[in-house]
UniProtKB/Swiss-Prot annotation:
Involved in the gluconeogenesis. Catalyzes stereospecifically the conversion of dihydroxyacetone phosphate (DHAP) to D-glyceraldehyde-3-phosphate (G3P). The gene is tpiA. It comes from Lactococcus lactis subsp. cremoris (strain SK11). PROSITE patterns: TIM_1, TIM_2. Pathway: Carbohydrate biosynthesis; gluconeogenesis; Carbohydrate degradation; glycolysis; D-glyceraldehyde 3-phosphate from glycerone phosphate: step 1/1. GO terms for biological process: gluconeogenesis; glyceraldehyde-3-phosphate biosynthetic process; glycerol catabolic process; glycolytic process. This is Triosephosphate isomerase. It catalyses: D-glyceraldehyde 3-phosphate = dihydroxyacetone phosphate.
């Protein structure tokens, strides 16, 4: 089965509104065709509405970096999936290691978010990944499989076929370290095998799996050549327009 690549930036808590607007203006007319690749930027919620307006008519898609699992209520400071979708946003990132570590999000929280995001009409980008300690102990497969099983609990086969899973080894995020292409592909293969165990081969062949962790323009082509890697979730290299476009150059 042919899976369309998806290259997604994750700005985290960076940029001002004017900087975000300038970025969209710089990239929107220079992106490869969406027939070849999905080009996505994950931005702080404050910027999503003006970015959605500016990107009209372009190939750029947008992701929120988080959402809550309720669509309304007394949840001060949270953003609902329904409100995010109403802005025209296509994707919502959930389960990032920074959310798990700093905001104590659990697998159960992340699973509830996945269900709410699908119900609202967006697509989750579900993150998973292990610490250096887990990696060095040889327990990566066990850890990542557990995160995937918990994150997908109760989702339908159709939903899982359409979502995106991002494998990000925590020890390679923002550290300058990166897993070898072989390690990245092997662990993305573990993710795919876990999906196959839960939902069957047809679903596992449909789900798109990204690698994330210090991905750069000079390393992305080797990663994308691997069998189980369908895209990248990119932090630092997505912050500048030139660098983001360089990540997509192979698809032009």
């Amino acid at each position: 089965m042919s899976r369309k690549p998806i290259i997604a930036g994750n700005w985290k808590m960076n940029k001002t509104l004017s900087e975000a607007q300038a970025f969209v203006e710089a990239v929107k007319n220079n992106l490869p065709s969406s027939d070849n690749v999905e080009s996505v930027i994950g931005a702080p919620a404050l910027f999503l509405a003006p970015m959605a307006y500016l990107r009209q008519g372009s190939e750029l898609k947008l992701a929120a970096e988080n959402s809550y699992f309720e669509n309304a209520g007394a949840f001060t400071g949270e953003n609902s999936p329904a409100a995010i979708v109403d802005l025209g946003v296509e994707y919502i990132i959930i389960g990032h290691s920074e959310r798990r570590e700093y905001f104590h999000e659990t697998d159960e929280d992340i699973n509830k978010k996945a269900k709410a995001i699908f119900a609202a009409g967006a697509t989750p980008i579900l993150c998973c990944g292990e610490t250096l300690e887990t990696f060095e102990a040889g327990k990566t497969a066990e850890w990542v499989s557990g995160q995937i099983e918990a994150g997908l609990a109760g989702l339908t086969a159709e939903q899982v076929s359409n979502l995106v899973i991002a494998y990000e080894p925590i020890w390679a995020i923002g550290t300058g370290k990166t897993a070898t292409n072989e390690i990245a592909d092997e662990t993305c293969g573990v993710v795919r095998s876990t999906v196959e165990k839960l939902y069957g081969k047809e679903v596992s062949e449909a789900v798109r799996i990204q690698y994330g962790g210090s991905v750069k323009p000079e390393t992305i082509e080797g990663l994308m050549a691997k069998e189980n890697i369908d895209g990248a979730l990119v932090g630092g290299a997505s912050l500048e327009a030139d660098s983001f476009l360089a990540l997509l150059e192979m698809y032009k």
